[in-house]
């Protein structure tokens, strides 16, 4: 899930991306994985358990992280050395991959999400691969993919977060739903991110489109604007700057962030750590984000790349995700750390839109939002 650089541990060796140079063990697919009838056997062929010394280059967004020991264990077991190359946010990584389609600068790409999926798949940048471990992935996440181009690795929700301590001090009740955010009693209290420059900003815009439809979302934003909503370019400026719980004397107790922000607040607090977060998530109006990994078409290390995809669905990686990237694992039954179980929000009715609809309309929606809110 593309999120800003907040809270990400320094747990992986990372190289910079420049355009100029920029458990392989498997289980058989059960009923939960869907039928493989009619699928090219080459697409489902599992990679070998180990390799001659091989380097696999992973292209990823800046927020990718994995614990050093988890990655080292994979490398020791398989003989594969993983070179992680980060190149900005998810949109930037996908754009660069599209520009180099067929002659990729890496072997595997992680971080394409459901707002970018149709564009990436339509550009033909991925070689199809159906991991045997896909059977263990949540069915709703598997349903987003056709043609075995990519594999769901994690998911999370972009949600409105509120500063509970601020509202308690003022004797006010925090907003409970999207409609409440336009109430005059919350005037000048909310900060959001620009959808043209921010992943959570785009997610929140898409949430309002999913809720209010083509005929109503601009009216909703007109009400937010009239109610004094502030727009920042990115998450850092909004959460760490203008949000009253962000640590820098911000004055706005309502911000667009992530459902996993409250547990992150505890994990990365200085000692003595608080027993509970001072912020919470407004469960209404969250937008579900899903991140995928895929083997890049044209790689000369396709089998090793497939092994890395399998690794991302294995329990060592899946268990590591919550506290490395503050996302939920895609594999059903993966245990969560206590801090996630207690404090990460799990909205029952997250909003979403079909990836193809997002791809077809994203630029138009962002342009219309810019005209309605910033001009």
Where are these regions (language model features)?
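Ligand-binding pocket segment of bilobal, Venus flytrap-like solute-binding proteins
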Residues: 200-285
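A structural signal for short loop-to-beta-strand junctions that line the ligand-binding cleft
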Residues: 47, 104-109, 127-165, 179, ...
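C-terminal motif of bacterial Sec signal peptides marking the signal peptidase cleavage site
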Residues: 17-21
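Short beta-strand->loop
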Residues: 127-135, 150-151, 179-182, 253, ...
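Periplasmic solute-binding protein
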Residues: 114-125, 145-173, 201-211, 288-294
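Early extracytoplasmic/lumenal segment of secretory-pathway proteins
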Residues: 23, 33, 37-119
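Mature extracytoplasmic/periplasmic domains
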Residues: 293-352
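Extracellular/periplasmic bilobal clamshell ligand-binding domains
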Residues: 338-375
């Amino acid at each position: 899930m593309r999120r800003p650089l907040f809270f990400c541990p320094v747990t992986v060796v990372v190289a910079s991306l420049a355009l100029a140079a920029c458990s392989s063990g498997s289980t058989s697919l059960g009923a939960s994985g869907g039928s493989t009838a009619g699928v090219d056997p080459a697409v489902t062929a599992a990679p070998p358990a180990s390799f001659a010394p091989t380097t696999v280059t992973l292209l990823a967004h800046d927020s990718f992280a994995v614990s050093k020991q988890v990655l080292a264990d994979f490398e020791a077991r398989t003989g594969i050395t993983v070179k992680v190359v980060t190149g900005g946010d998810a949109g930037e990584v996908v754009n660069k991959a599209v520009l180099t389609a067929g002659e990729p600068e890496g072997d595997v790409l992680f971080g394409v999400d459901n707002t970018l999926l149709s564009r990436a798949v339509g550009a033909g940048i991925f070689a199809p691969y159906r991991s045997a471990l896909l059977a263990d992935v949540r069915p709703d996440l598997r349903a987003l993919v056709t043609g075995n181009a990519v594999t769901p690795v994690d998911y999370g929700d972009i949600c409105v977060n509120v500063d509970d301590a601020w509202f308690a001090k003022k004797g006010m009740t925090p907003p409970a739903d999207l409609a409440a955010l336009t109430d005059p009693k919350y005037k000048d209290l909310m900060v959001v991110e620009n959808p043209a420059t921010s992943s959570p900003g785009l997610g929140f815009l898409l949430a309002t489109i999913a809720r209010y439809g083509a005929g109503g979302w601009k009216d909703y934003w007109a009400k937010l604007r009239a109610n004094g909503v502030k727009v920042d370019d990115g998450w850092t400026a909004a959460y760490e700057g203008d949000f009253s719980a962000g640590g820098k004397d911000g004055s706005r107790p309502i911000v667009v962030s992530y459902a996993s922000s409250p547990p992150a607040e505890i994990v990365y607090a200085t000692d003595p750590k608080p027993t509970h977060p001072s912020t919470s998530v407004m469960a209404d109006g969250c937008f579900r984000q899903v991140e995928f990994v895929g083997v890049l078409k044209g790689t000369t290390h396709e089998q090793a790349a497939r092994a890395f995809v399998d690794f991302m669905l294995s329990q060592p990686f899946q268990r590591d995700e919550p506290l490395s990237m503050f996302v939920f694992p895609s594999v059903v039954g993966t245990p969560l750390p206590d801090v996630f179980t207690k404090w990460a929000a799990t909205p029952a009715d997250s909003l979403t839109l079909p990836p193809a609809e997002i791809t077809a309309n994203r630029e138009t929606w962002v342009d219309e939002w810019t005209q309605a809110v910033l001009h």
